[in-house]
């Protein structure tokens, strides 16, 4: 039986693996919309910027008064899958007893899922946090 945190992490990962962020063309618009919606009630300051309307980067920050900062970075673009090399649909996360399989699940959407969970729950997990924490979700790494 999965605990509550593991279930939420897998739900996030399942949702973001479904989003096509293949480079080329490298569109991250749908992913950015997901991040904004997921973090909507997090009380973090969320900024988006990009080179164009399709390649959008997100920064979510708690903006404390501290001079110390920590950045959690995830790139969210993936390579285009070679479908003949996949036994399953790369856009549908497959979960077995030990592993999760899906396009970008290891590089780097798995990290993005953890960062999203941490960002959303930052105040609850670390109520006395004094440092600046920034979560960046960037495109065009590939």
Question: What are these regions, as identified by a protein language model?
Answer:
Residues 108-142:
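Acidic/histidine-rich catalytic neighborhood of metal-dependent amide-processing enzymes
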Residues 2-105, 122-130:
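Acidic/His- and Gly-rich active-site-bordering loop/insert found
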């Amino acid at each position: 039986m999965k605990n509550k945190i593991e279930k939420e992490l897998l739900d996030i990962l399942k949702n973001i693996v479904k989003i096509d962020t293949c480079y080329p063309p490298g569109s991250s618009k749908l992913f950015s919309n997901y991040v904004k919606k997921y973090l909507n009630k997090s009380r973090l300051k969320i900024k988006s910027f990009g080179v164009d309307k399709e390649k959008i980067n997100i920064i979510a920050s708690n903006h404390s008064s501290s001079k110390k900062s920590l950045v959690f970075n995830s790139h969210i673009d993936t390579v285009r899958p070679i479908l003949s090399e996949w036994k399953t649909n790369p856009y549908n996360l497959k979960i077995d007893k030990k592993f999760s399989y899906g396009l970008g699940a290891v590089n780097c959407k798995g990290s993005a899922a953890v960062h999203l969970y941490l960002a959303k729950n930052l105040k609850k997990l670390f109520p006395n946090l004094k440092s600046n924490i920034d979560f960046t979700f960037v495109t065009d790494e590939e």
